[in-house]
From Swiss-Prot:
<dbReference type="Pfam" id="PF00603">
    <property type="entry name" value="Flu_PA"/>
</dbReference>
<dbReference type="GO" id="GO:0006351">
    <property type="term" value="P:DNA-templated transcription"/>
</dbReference>
<keyword id="KW-1157">Cap snatching</keyword>
<feature type="binding site">
    <location>
        <position position="108"/>
    </location>
    <ligand>
        <name>Mn(2+) 2</name>
    </ligand>
</feature>
<feature type="short sequence motif" description="Nuclear localization signal 2 (NLS2)">
    <location>
        <begin position="184"/>
        <end position="247"/>
    </location>
</feature>
<dbReference type="GO" id="GO:0004519">
    <property type="term" value="F:endonuclease activity"/>
</dbReference>
<keyword id="KW-1190">Host gene expression shutoff by virus</keyword>
<feature type="binding site">
    <location>
        <position position="108"/>
    </location>
    <ligand>
        <name>Mn(2+) 1</name>
    </ligand>
</feature>
<comment type="subunit">
    <text>Influenza RNA polymerase is composed of three subunits: PB1, PB2 and PA. Interacts (via C-terminus) with PB1 (via N-terminus).</text>
</comment>
<dbReference type="GO" id="GO:0075526">
    <property type="term" value="P:cap snatching"/>
</dbReference>
<keyword id="KW-0945">Host-virus interaction</keyword>
<keyword id="KW-1262">Eukaryotic host gene expression shutoff by virus</keyword>
<dbReference type="GO" id="GO:0075523">
    <property type="term" value="P:viral translational frameshifting"/>
</dbReference>
<dbReference type="InterPro" id="IPR038372">
    <property type="entry name" value="PA/PA-X_sf"/>
</dbReference>
<feature type="binding site">
    <location>
        <position position="41"/>
    </location>
    <ligand>
        <name>Mn(2+) 1</name>
    </ligand>
</feature>
<comment type="similarity">
    <text>Belongs to the influenza viruses PA family.</text>
</comment>
<feature type="binding site">
    <location>
        <position position="80"/>
    </location>
    <ligand>
        <name>Mn(2+) 2</name>
    </ligand>
</feature>
Length: 716
């Protein structure tokens, strides 16, 4: 029978039937007749829907394949064949949009013309017997029932057959053909006799019959029947049992399960030491942009052309000087590097035709800044394995750093709105199915909340910089290429805008492995005076390079313009992930969706619209020393996005470890809040695992401080 089914039915139908049987824990190798019945039922549902459309006038029409008008609305929504969650989502959506009564059981189809759900039946017995069984099970006047048999008979509610005669004849012919094919292989009799009646779930949920036998058979050793096992589980006290099991395992294991009470957890110990410093690959809140609106210059879109055009918008350049030296670096080299960039940009402008890319002269200052010839020479292992004192470099333990307020300010700034639009709404065609309509509605609401967000600017900036750097690393491996740091956006009025943040000069980049490092020097414009928070800028040499006139309430004011210069490095794998920072949008959208789903399941209807449009409602955003912070749904969207973006910008082994280990502690605390009486052993070991990740990373230290606020408020 299984071979016959695979030959006789479309592979897609066979695959759906396999999934359905798997979902209900049935073996298609054993239940071959059931397999054939499911395939037959699926095919009838699909044939019922095929070629039936609704035109612009709302009339039902039949369109055969190959007709150019086939983009009309389908008359029937197919519910059968989808997984249960998706099927119920579609049913709920249809009920919300059409006002139809929600059925108790999943129907097979929805008819948009007659506005009713349809239950399709295919029987090997008398149609009227099967019809009565279906009606008795559904107990709903609203769901339309249509039964077909393998003998060409049919029966439908109130003799209303929904489809035209030709469409129904096509279904009956197909069923007759299946019967003939089965009979010719000697499979029909077994198939006909295997049909059971519709089974309804009793109101009192008692396990009887086959299920009861299976329950009695599927018990752990030492239990005679299901009732004994159920009684044992109901009275089970886990803590003492686990202790006993552990003591049997080994003489060394001596774990006592300690109850986890409100007084048990202590705050995480944050490290002492000098304040932590900025370690992102580009400036965040301190960045300054030189911008052009409605760019239409020759070569628009070519980064070097755009950069030169942006540089021309500023007239306040002055002789640069170091205002905050880098403690360990040769600061005159950073100064000379900036002067070299200005000089070489001037050279380009003097040329008749501006080149598309610019490779910098390999001066001594750039060689120093890019670590040229600084790497120790690699020697083949065979040539030195006889060296007696061969050993790995002694590496210093990382210096402990304390949390500094600047990282919280950075995060707050990332959640704020800017006056530009950083992402466009997707240009997506008309939605066909209700589920697509819900998805695109959620996406549009979410995009509207985050398109102006500074975190979204960081995404687009990160994508651009990483893409440009990876391209240059592959295309110009030996060159010190000058790479402008550019982003594009739209103003509130919808005008296009190109922004220049500064420049990167990349070093030699023969990147064979994913983790091979390419060095680069970044030079970024800013109005932030580094002397206000010198600890934040430990890794930078900061120059004063000009004066910028800014409009303010009292008229124009002049502010010094700074250039933040540092040597940095990245790898192929880091650039690859940097190029995919748009995933942060998807991650935070999914988090918002799960909030909407939770709300929708309580209200039993899709709550997307209410969720985003009820401006008076506030939602929890996070913990602070003051307590639980709340805000609008837009603020929640932007905060979740900023967290995701910072996880990408500040990705590190410390963050990986902290996230994984602190999650365990979080789950225990959550269990306590839910009155689940959690027990723990070696809680000290868990704290150790969390705290060994608290070294010097600003984002990890901030998360640890948030975690402590959460502990304080969660356990009040």
């Amino acid at each position: 029978m299984e071979d016959f089914v695979r030959q006789c039915f479309n592979p897609m139908i066979v695959e759906l039937a396999e999934k359905a049987m798997k979902e209900y824990g049935e073996d298609l190798k054993v239940e071959t007749n059931k397999f054939a019945a499911i395939c037959t039922h699926l095919e009838v549902c699909f044939m019922y829907s095929d070629f039936h459309f609704i035109n612009e006038q709302g009339e039902s029409i039949i369109v055969e394949l190959g007709d150019p008008n086939a983009l009309l609305k389908h008359r029937f929504e197919i519910i059968e064949g989808r997984d249960r969650t998706m099927a119920w989502t579609i049913v709920n959506s249809i009920c919300n949009t059409t006002g139809a009564e929600k059925p108790k059981f999943l129907p097979d189809l929805y008819d948009y013309k007659e506005n009713r759900f349809i239950e399709i039946g295919v029987t090997r017995r008398e149609v009227h017997i099967y019809y009565l069984e279906k009606a008795n099970k559904i107990k709903s006047e609203k769901t339309h029932i249509h039964i077909f048999s393998f003998t060409g008979e049919e029966m439908a509610t109130k003799a209303d057959y929904t489809l035209d005669e030709e469409s129904r004849a096509r279904i009956k012919t197909r069923l007759f053909t299946i019967r003939q094919e089965m009979a010719s292989r000697g499979l029909w009799d077994s198939f006909r006799q295997s049909e059971r009646g519709e089974e309804t779930i009793e109101e009192r949920f008692e396990i009887t019959g086959t299920m009861r036998k299976l329950a009695d058979q599927s018990l752990p050793p030492n239990f005679s029947c299901f009732e004994n096992f159920r009684a044992y589980v109901d009275g089970f006290e886990p803590n003492g049992y686990i202790e006993g099991k552990l003591s049997q395992m080994s003489k060394e294991v001596n774990a006592r399960i300690e109850p986890f009470l409100k007084t048990t957890p202590r705050p995480l110990k944050l490290p002492d030491g000098p304040p932590c410093s900025q370690r992102s690959k580009f400036l965040l809140m301190d960045a300054l942009k030189l911008s052009i609106e409605d760019p239409s210059h020759e070569g628009e879109g070519i980064p070097l052309y755009d950069a030169i055009k942006c540089m021309r918008t500023f007239f306040g350049w002055k002789e640069p000087n170091v205002v905050k030296p880098h403690e360990k670096g040769i600061n005159p080299n950073y100064l000379l590097s900036w002067k070299q960039v200005l000089a070489e940009l001037q050279d380009i402008e003097n040329e008749e035709k501006i080149p598309k890319t610019k490779n910098m002269k390999k001066t001594s200052q750039l060689k120093w800044a890019l670590g040229e010839n600084m790497a120790p020479e690699k020697v083949d292992f065979d040539d030195c394995k006889d060296v007696s004192d061969l050993k790995q470099y002694d590496s210093d333990e990382p210096e402990l750093r304390s949390l500094s307020s600047w990282i919280q300010n950075e995060f707050n700034k990332a959640c704020e709105l800017t006056d530009s639009i950083w992402i466009e709404l997707d240009e997506i065609g008309e939605d066909v199915a209700p589920i697509e309509h819900i998805a695109s509605m959620r996406r549009n609401y979410f995009t509207a909340e985050v398109s102006h967000c500074r975190a979204t600017e960081y995404i687009m900036k990160g994508v651009y910089i990483n893409t440009a750097l990876l391209n240059a690393s592959c295309a110009a491996m030996d060159d010190f290429q000058l790479i402008p740091m550019i982003s594009k956006c739209r103003t509130k009025e919808g005008r296009r805008k190109t922004n220049l943040y500064g420049f990167i000069i990349k070093g030699r980049s023969h990147l064979r492995n994913d983790t091979d490092v390419v060095n680069f020097v970044s030079m970024e414009f800013s109005l932030t005076d580094p002397r206000l928070e010198p600890h934040k800028w430990e890794k930078y040499c900061v120059l004063e390079i000009g004066d910028m006139l800014l409009r303010s309430a009292i008229g124009q004011v002049s502010r010094p313009m700074f250039l933040y210069v540092r040597t940095n490095g990245t790898s192929k794998i880091k650039m690859k992930w940097g190029m995919e920072m748009r995933r942060c949008l998807l991650q935070s959208l999914q988090q918002i969706e799960s909030m909407i789903e939770a709300e929708s399941s309580v209200k039993e209807k899709d709550m997307t619209k209410e969720f985003f449009e009820n401006k008076s409602e506030t939602w929890p955003i996070g913990e602070s020393p003051k307590g639980v912070e709340e805000g609008s749904i837009g603020k929640v969207c932007r905060t979740l996005l900023a967290k995701s973006v910072f996880n990408s910008l500040y990705a590190s082994p410390q963050l990986e470890g902290f996230s994984a280990e602190s999650r365990k502690l979080l789950l225990i605390v959550q269990a306590l809040r839910d009155n689940l009486e959690p027990g723990t052993f070696d809680l000290g070991g868990l704290y150790e695992a969390v705290e060994e990740c608290l070294i010097n990373d600003p984002w990890v230290l901030l998360n640890a401080s948030w975690f402590n606020s959460f502990l304080t408020h969660a356990l009040r």
